[in-house]
């Protein structure tokens, strides 16, 4: 599928600059104002900046090394702003794992998972190759009037794929010629969609930190159903909450229907959620492309289901989570069959 780079750029500018712009400016200001050496490191401005970075570090949105005053920094770039997809953190990495060599203080800025759709698209610079995703970030920061580098800090993008022989990609100051369109595969669209749902469940509900009663990661797989349509989701919620109110709990804030009873491997699902990123996809794709994507993840299709993992905090190791889509076509088929309510598919 060919998608317009201008549409993708404008969409991510809306998300990063307009929705999250205040936080981005705050994090850049803290990195700029943090002084590491001399009397200036003890000024009220620097101490306040250090306090802010420590708070972000507690929320897994930053990193600051201990005993900063005892270090010899020389000519090292010792501070950094790192843009990273949330899936990197929910996949088990800690902020410290993302820090470039020599950096002792950093803040993380989470980017939409849809930005990773551009990771495979290589932009050739004079002596380097960078993913289009990092170039797009540079352009957005420039439009936000933010310098990507300073005398003692740099900006980076953590690229999840290993195509560039490194994951930490330094944001370039100059902007190369941008392509007018990019080709996106349905498989990548499905992968990113699952990443978004996975992030929702982990960051919004924290549900994988406490295992359901009777669930063992060694032998069981959590099952999550997700849908692109609010109408389908609301119908399911009404049905299960009215028919079996003691088995489920619904979070209107996070759009998640959770099973509360003892875990059984025969249950068709453990959680049912609305994928909120569908509106983002509809901005990137044409109507025909969006329909093709829904067809590809429909009933009986190879992209119907996907397995993700979450690092368990217990001795059992990783938790395996199976995600499966419920599309408008599935709902229509249910109506044709004469069903008065949607039925959970067998998994």
Swiss-Prot record:
Listed GO biological process terms: symbiont-mediated suppression of host innate immune response
Domain of life: Viruses
Keyword Repeat: no
Xref: Pfam families: Phytoreo_Pns (PF05451)
The entry's keywords: Host-virus interaction, Inhibition of host innate immune response by virus, Suppressor of RNA silencing, Viral immunoevasion
InterPro entries named among the record's database cross-references: Phytoreo_Pns
Family classification: Belongs to the phytoreovirus non-structural protein 10 family.
Its biological purpose: Suppressor of RNA-mediated gene silencing, also known as post-transcriptional gene silencing (PTGS), a mechanism of plant viral defense that limits the accumulation of viral RNAs.
Protein name per its UniProtKB record: Suppressor of RNA-mediated gene silencing
Source species: Wound tumor virus (WTV)
Taxonomic lineage: Viruses, Riboviria, Orthornavirae, Duplornaviricota, Resentoviricetes
């Amino acid at each position: 599928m060919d998608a317009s780079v201008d549409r993708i750029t404008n969409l991510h500018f809306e998300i990063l600059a307009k929705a999250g712009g205040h936080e981005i400016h705050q994090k850049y200001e803290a990195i700029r104002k943090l002084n590491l050496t001399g009397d200036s490191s003890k000024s009220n401005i620097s101490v306040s900046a250090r306090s802010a970075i420590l708070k972000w570090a507690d929320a897994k949105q930053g990193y600051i090394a201990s005993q900063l005053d005892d270090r010899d920094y020389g000519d090292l770039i010792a501070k950094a702003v790192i843009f990273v997809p949330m899936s990197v953190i929910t996949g088990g990495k800690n902020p410290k794992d993302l820090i470039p060599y020599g950096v002792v203080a950093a803040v993380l800025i989470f980017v939409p998972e849809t930005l990773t759709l551009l990771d495979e698209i290589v932009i050739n610079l004079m002596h380097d190759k960078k993913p289009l995703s990092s170039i797009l970030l540079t352009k957005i920061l420039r439009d936000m009037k933010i310098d990507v580098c300073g005398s003692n800090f740099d900006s980076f993008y953590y690229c999840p794929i290993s195509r560039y022989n490194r994951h930490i990609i330094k944001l370039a100051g100059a902007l190369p010629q941008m392509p007018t369109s990019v080709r996106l595969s349905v498989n990548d669209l499905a992968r990113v969609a699952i990443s978004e749902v996975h992030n929702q469940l982990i960051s919004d509900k924290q549900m994988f930190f406490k295992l359901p009663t009777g669930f063992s990661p060694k032998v069981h797989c959590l099952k999550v159903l997700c849908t692109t349509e609010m109408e389908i989701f609301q119908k399911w919620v009404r049905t299960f909450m009215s028919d079996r109110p003691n088995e489920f709990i619904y979070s209107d804030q996070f759009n998640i229907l959770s099973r509360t009873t003892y875990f059984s491997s025969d249950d068709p699902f453990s959680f049912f959620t609305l994928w909120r990123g569908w509106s983002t996809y509809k901005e990137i794709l044409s109507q025909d492309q969006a329909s093709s994507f829904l067809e590809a993840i429909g009933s009986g299709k190879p992209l119907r289901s996907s397995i993700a993992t979450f690092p368990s905090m217990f001795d059992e190791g990783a938790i395996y989570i199976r995600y499966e889509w419920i599309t408008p076509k599935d709902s229509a088929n249910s109506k044709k069959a004469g069903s008065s309510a949607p039925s959970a598919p067998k998994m």
